[in-house]
Design a protein with these regions (language model features):
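Conserved small/polar residues in nucleotide/adenosyl-binding loops
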Residues: 266-273
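Hydrophobic alpha-helical segments, chiefly the membrane-spanning helices
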Residues: 277-284
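Structured aminoacyl-transfer and RNA-binding surfaces used for tRNA recognition/handling
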Residues: 22-247, 251-265
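Intrinsic disorder/low-complexity detector
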Residues: 196, 273-275
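Conserved oxyanion/phosphate-binding beta-strand-loop segments in alpha/beta enzyme cores
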Residues: 1-18
Length: 284
């Protein structure tokens, strides 16, 4: 196991402290996590997204507004005494910033990005599909959220897809894009693209991002409307995507950067990175 070989991720220690699905990142593993989070945020900000650092707990209204509740209540951690939920994605608190809002047409587009830990009960504790970094109860993710005029939302979706493509290209990872068919779509989404990177060790593709257009589904629940200035108010369209989710990206970077001298990984940003080139490598 490469994470043990390089002493960068400790699953046994996480199991001791909390339980299965809560790894401890150590040494250069922790540095890699931090560097990637900053790298993703900087890439998003360079495209006009404004950074948000939201709460990690949300109330029931917030979970309902974005569609996690009641549908996915069994997959969310619930603090019963306070009736609050640990977020499964930054999409929930960030989109809820504009709950019960009337936006002027000149306020659009709204482009937000944020890093948060994410918490999901859905992960199992055994089996090949949940081993290592494949499925975790707690993981790090950087999200992008858009609130848009309905006439522009599909153009914006294409822009978001291209943006995620550019990040994966900078990381020089083998990836593919899937347009989900109707039967695979979540009930909140009108159109979703999944991004998958190839795992050499597992010899299969692993999802690292989903980019979705929810059209007016979320805005109808959230009551987010646009004032067009002629006494016309219509529901906005909301979109979001992962840019990016870290665990499987970390696994793919480790697997795809093995050399005879060790592992070449992205450990720190540089002036070249700030000009839009890939992050530099250093040997472990």
């Amino acid at each position: 196991d490469l994470s043990s070989k390089y002493d960068i991720i400790d699953f046994d220690l996480g199991n001791k402290i909390t339980g299965a699905g809560f790894p401890v990142y150590k040494n250069k593993g922790a540095k890699l996590q931090r560097s990637l989070i900053n790298f993703f945020l900087d890439k998003n900000i360079s495209k006009g997204y404004n950074e948000i650092q939201p709460p990690l707990l949300v109330n029931e209204d917030s979970g309902f507004g974005t569609g996690q509740l009641p549908d996915k209540e069994g997959q969310m951690y619930h603090v019963q005494n306070d009736n609050l939920y640990l977020i499964p994605t930054a999409e929930v608190p960030i989109t809820n910033i504009y709950r019960n809002s009337i936006l002027k047409i000149d306020d659009l587009p709204i482009k937000l990005t944020g890093y948060t830990p994410c918490f999901r009960r859905e992960a199992g504790s055994y089996g090949s599909d949940v081993r290592g970094l494949n499925r975790l109860h707690q993981f790090d993710k950087v999200e992008i959220v858009r609130i848009e005029c309905p006439t522009k939302s599909y153009q914006v979706l294409d822009e978001m897809v291209e943006h995620v493509k550019s990040i994966l290209s900078d990381l020089e990872l083998p990836f593919r894009i899937l347009r989900l068919c109707g039967g695979d779509l979540g009930f909140t989404s009108a159109l979703t693209y999944d991004f998958e990177v190839y795992s050499k060790a597992q010899k299969k593709w692993l999802e690292v991002s989903s980019v979705s257009n929810f059209e007016s589904y979320q805005s109808n629940r959230l009551k987010v409307r646009i004032d067009y200035g002629d006494k016309t108010k219509k529901l906005a369209h909301t979109l979001n995507g992962s840019a990016l989710a870290l665990p499987r990206i970390v696994a793919a970077l480790i697997e795809n950067n093995q050399t005879d001298k060790g592992c070449l990984l992205y450990t720190s940003p540089s002036p070249r990175d700030q000009r839009g080139s890939r992050m530099p490598s250093s040997a472990w």
